[in-house]
Swiss-Prot record:
Bias type Low complexity, positions: 29-56
Gene name in the database record: FNDC5
Positions glycosylated per UniProt: N87, N132
Protein name: Fibronectin type III domain-containing protein 5
Expression tissues: Widely expressed, with highest levels in heart. Very low expression, if any, in colon, pancreas and spleen.
Modifications the protein undergoes after translation, according to the UniProt entry: The extracellular domain is cleaved and released from the cell membrane.
Motif mapping: Microbody targeting signal: 258-260
Signal sequence, start to end: none
Chain segments carrying region Disordered: 1-56, 230-260
One BP term from GO: response to muscle activity
Length: 260
């Protein structure tokens, strides 16, 4: 009855199979009716899957591809990023503050620096960013006395940040030790000042004594010259007086002669 009913209503066209239970069984389970607007060769969802596209690869192959692309991008970023700062040192170390300084390579073009500070064996991190191309130092404040800290420095450019520098470990002194060293320095400076004053006084005394001796010697030489110049005159006067006493004159103007 079904065959006769289907054949009597519509004659089958040549080259077009009839639609029957056998045709419905050929469709995969779960596939809906194809849209009349769908392009030929597309599945019912409208997405085209090529055999060579990554979406058709196994999950492990796609994960390996993502990992490789990530490594390539990271390598490109690292190639463009600046080098890590060098010669990182900590100076002006006090109980609650310090100053970290560094250098960069001459060919590097940076727009700022990032300083990370943390306590040793503690995960808490302090991040300081300095947007200044000329600065090569940064002050660390609010430090705890007698505590160890670790400092890293990074250079910042347009391409990104550089790798972190070599870690620098330093320890803040105690306040009592700082005061003791300060008092010791003050005592040393006072002693040096006193010694300097004593040395200055001794030098002044020596100079005054030398000037006095020079004056005495000059006065003695002057007096000696005067005495030496007066000696011939004294000799002449003595000779003249001696001659006058040995040859007395006569009252009449003649010399007295002794009688034999």
């Amino acid at each position: 009855m079904q065959a006769a009913r289907g054949g009597a209503g519509r004659p089958e066209r040549p080259g077009r199979p009839g639609r029957g239970p056998e045709r419905e069984r050929e469709r995969p389970p779960g596939a809906g009716a194809a849209s009349p607007c769908a392009a030929p060769g597309l599945p019912a969802g409208g997405a085209t899957i090529h055999p060579g596209s990554p979406s058709a690869w196994p999950p492990r192959a796609r994960a390996a591809l993502r990992l490789w692309l990530g490594c390539v991008c990271f390598a490109l970023v690292q190639a463009d990023s600046p080098s890590a700062p060098v010669n990182v040192t900590v100076r002006h170390l006090k109980a609650n503050s310090a100053v970290v300084s560094w250098d960069v390579l001459e060919d590097e073009v940076v727009i700022g620096f990032a300083i990370s500070q943390q306590k040793k064996d503690v995960r808490m991190l302090r991040f300081i960013q300095e947007v200044n191309t000329t600065t090569r130092s940064c002050a660390l404040w609010d430090l705890e006395e007698d505590t160890e800290y670790i400092v890293h420095v990074q250079a910042i450019s347009i391409q990104g940040q550089s790798p972190a520098s070599e870690p620098v470990l330093f320890k803040t002194p105690r306040e009592a030790e700082k005061m003791a060293s300060k008092n010791k320095d003050e005592v040393t400076m006072k002693e040096m000042g006193r010694n300097q004053q004593l040395r200055t006084g001794e030098v002044l005394i020596i100079v005054v004594v030398l000037f006095m001796w020079a004056g005495v010697i000059a006065l003695f030489c002057r007096q000696y010259d005067i005495i030496k110049d007066n000696e011939p005159n004294n000799n002449k006067e003595k000779t003249k007086s001696a001659s006058e006493t040995s040859t007395p004159e006569h009252q009449g103007g003649g010399l007295l002669r002794s009688k034999i």
